[in-house]
Structure formats: structure tokens, C-alpha cells
Design a protein with these regions (language model features):
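An N-terminally biased module of ancient metal coordination in phosphate/nucleic-acid-related enzymes
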Residues: 1-84
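Extended substrate/RNA-proximal surfaces in nucleic-acid metabolism proteins
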Residues: 48-137
């Protein structure tokens, strides 16, 4: 069985300060065969900035990919915040970048981040779940 991790965030993401090298070294220590960096890119995140400097991202990760080629397989991906208000921008962004892997995640519904709980105020559990599932369709 191959051991892989395809969901890793680095200092390129607003939610991490870790360096890609730290992740790579830890993955090797843990015996992983393959990893994929999937830093965030959200187009309308209401709290923090989840922009992604793709030029710097690909430059740093490509250099590390070459450096570690004999020790671990490294892929370059992205976690895109799915937001139907920005679907054209998202599709253009993904098409323009040579990502090996793309995760689509819902972080925001109706300009509200639900991680911090504001999204759930005044809603039943069923109402909140319905809005989430409708956003995924």
C-alpha cells in the first residue's frame, strides 16, 4: 500500500506558517511515498486573505520537487474555495495553472464563513445543512 497525503498547507496559505521543506522532511520521516501541497485560493473570503502567489508557489515547490526527486514524490495542487458567485474566475484560475491536483472546498456560503459559527446563527441544524448541500450542487 502506498502512503500519501494530498492535503497540506504551507506559508503560501493564510492558515499556515509551515514551510514546504518542513512538510517534506516530516513526510519522509513518516514513511510517506507521495505528497501534494494544496494551499488555499479563495476568491471572496470574508475574514483573512486566501490569495495564492502562484508564481512564487510553483517556483519554490518545483525546486523542492527536483531536490527531493529520489526520496519522495511531490505534487503541486491547490484547495479552491468553491463559490458559485465566482465560478468563472475559479474555472479560469484552475485552467491557467498546471496543478497536479485540485481540491474543491466550500468555506463560504452567502459571504459568510461557517467555520467560526456565524453561519449557523438563527438556523436549525437542518436549515444549515440544506444550505450547505444546496451550495455543493
Amino acid at each position: 500500500m502506498r502512503k500519501i497525503d494530498y492535503h497540506m498547507h504551507t506559508h503560501f496559505s493564510g492558515d499556515s506558517e509551515a514551510s514546504p521543506r518542513e512538510h517534506i522532511e516530516q513526510a519522509i520521516r513518516m514513511g510517506l511515498d507521495e505528497i501534494c501541497f494544496t494551499d488555499h485560493r479563495d476568491f471572496d473570503y470574508p475574514i483573512d486573505t486566501f490569495d495564492l502567489d502562484t508564481d512564487a508557489y510553483f517556483m519554490e515547490l518545483s525546486a523542492l520537487k527536483n531536490e527531493y526527486v529520489d526520496r519522495i514524490t511531490i505534487k503541486i495542487g491547490v484547495e479552491v474555495g468553491l463559490d458559485m458567485d465566482h465560478i468563472d474566475e475559479i474555472n479560469t484560475f484552475v485552467a491557467q495553472c498546471p496543478f497536479d491536483y485540485v481540491i474543491g472546498s466550500i468555506h463560504v456560503i452567502h459571504h459568510t464563513e461557517f467555520y467560526y459559527g456565524e453561519f449557523f446563527k438563527g438556523k436549525t441544524k437542518e436549515e444549515a445543512h440544506r444550505e450547505f448541500f444546496e451550495e455543493t450542487l
